[in-house]
A protein has these predicted regions:
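Structural motif
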Residues: 15-16, 38-39, 48, 73-74, ...
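The conserved cystathionine-beta-synthase
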Residues: 18-35, 82-100, 107
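Short, charge-rich amphipathic segments
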Residues: 22-33, 64-75, 110
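Tandem CBS (Bateman) regulatory domains
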Residues: 1-13, 52-81, 88-97, 118-144
Length: 144
């Protein structure tokens, strides 16, 4: 099973962030432009939360808040679940399923060094399974 470190080597470590002072509209526009589902929210270079599509769907739309006036900080998820570079992709999947989340910021010594999405996890697991299938096919073919 791959580690978060290995996954980030393939995926890359870039993380899109936004200031807590930004508006929800600013956040949504950046997410749409970058084709991503979340932004890590920062204050004084420190991670203080995450803003996701689900935050918008659950906390802005239904409450009829104005995205141009609502600050991202007001609707972001504060109880951040993170992983470190040494955790496995399987551990990430379990965290995501158990906590009903789609994004995991990756921290190293208190610093944000990447982010993993549910799509990254699924892709990695599929690639690993395909590798094992090919190994089994080769083994079976070699027995004939």
């Amino acid at each position: 099973m791959n580690s978060v470190r290995q996954l980030l080597k393939v995926k890359g470590k870039h993380v899109w962030t936004i200031s807590k002072e930004s508006t929800v509209l600013d956040s949504l526009e950046l997410m749409a432009e970058k084709r991503i589902g979340s932004l890590v929210v920062i204050e004084d270079s420190q991670v203080i939360g995450i803003f996701t599509e689900r935050d918008y769907a659950r906390k802005v739309g239904p409450e009829r808040r104005n995205p141009e006036e609502t600050r991202t900080e007001e609707v972001m998820t504060r109880e951040l679940i993170t992983v470190d570079l040494n955790q496995t992709v399987n551990e990430c999947m379990v965290l995501m399923v158990d906590n009903h989340i789609r994004h995991l910021p990756v921290m190293d010594d208190g610093r944000l060094v990447g982010i993993i999405s549910v799509g990254d996890v699924v892709k990695d697991i599929i690639e690993e399974l395909e590798f094992h299938v090919e190994q089994l096919k080769s083994y079976i073919t070699g027995l004939r």
